[in-house]
């Protein structure tokens, strides 16, 4: 999906967390490339629909990260489907996906759906515990998952998810070096524009989530930081 390939900065909103109208407006008009709606727990059709309706007052592209098929609804520009590559349970790799397609496959517009190959690396986060992710990985393990995502499974997105803690930029750099066509998303622990800029040196797309609720002004400042670094990278590529 070409529109996703253009994303450099993305905000992720949790439908189970409150955000007032004034902050939502500032976030949607901040210059971010997209807003992803998604969370690990407490995601319902009601809170997803409520957040979607509020975001739709603005022109920013809006994606739903599908973690619970019961909260699936029309109206989003893109549907992102996580495949947790380092999960110890098959349901997070293929099981839930099979069940969703079994129920709704006839109605799916596959042009609006993109799979994300997740590698969850924070053992304390809700997502790691829920999916029983094997987080005891060295950099070679992580790079191997990235290569599997691109070359074996042909996934359009590889998502390094540190969820709540700031990751190791050297790991992100090595993963980026291993990828050619697959787009590298990074999410986790970004609370300052400096951190966002650092990760944007390597990741194709930087996702900012928790800072929206914990450090809102800093979260907004990450947009310009990421865009500036993305511009520098594009300039370097053009030399």
Swiss-Prot record:
Origin superkingdom: Bacteria
Cofactor(s) the protein needs: Mg(2+)
BP GO terms, sorted: glycerophospholipid biosynthetic process
Catalytic activity, reaction form: sn-glycerol 1-phosphate + all-trans-heptaprenyl diphosphate = 3-heptaprenyl-sn-glycero-1-phosphate + diphosphate
Broad class of enzyme this protein falls into: transferase
One Pfam family linked to the record: PcrB
Keywords for this protein: Lipid biosynthesis, Lipid metabolism, Magnesium, Metal-binding, Phospholipid biosynthesis, Phospholipid metabolism, Transferase
Pathway assigned in UniProt: Membrane lipid metabolism; glycerophospholipid metabolism
Binding-site list for Mg(2+): 14, 40
GO molecular function terms attached to this record: heptaprenylglyceryl phosphate synthase activity; magnesium ion binding; prenyltransferase activity
Entry binding sites for sn-glycerol 1-phosphate: 12, 159-164, 189, 209-210
EC number: 2.5.1.n9
Family: Belongs to the GGGP/HepGP synthase family. Group I subfamily.
Protein task: Prenyltransferase that catalyzes in vivo the transfer of the heptaprenyl moiety of heptaprenyl pyrophosphate (HepPP; 35 carbon atoms) to the C3 hydroxyl of sn-glycerol-1-phosphate (G1P), producing heptaprenylglyceryl phosphate (HepGP). This reaction is an ether-bond-formation step in the biosynthesis of archaea-type G1P-based membrane lipids found in Bacillales. To a much lesser extent, is also able to use geranylgeranyl diphosphate (GGPP; C20) as the prenyl donor.
Subunit structure: Homodimer.
Identification of the protein by name: Heptaprenylglyceryl phosphate synthase
Naturally occurring in which organism (per UniProt): Geobacillus kaustophilus (strain HTA426)
Name of the gene encoding the protein in the UniProt record: pcrB
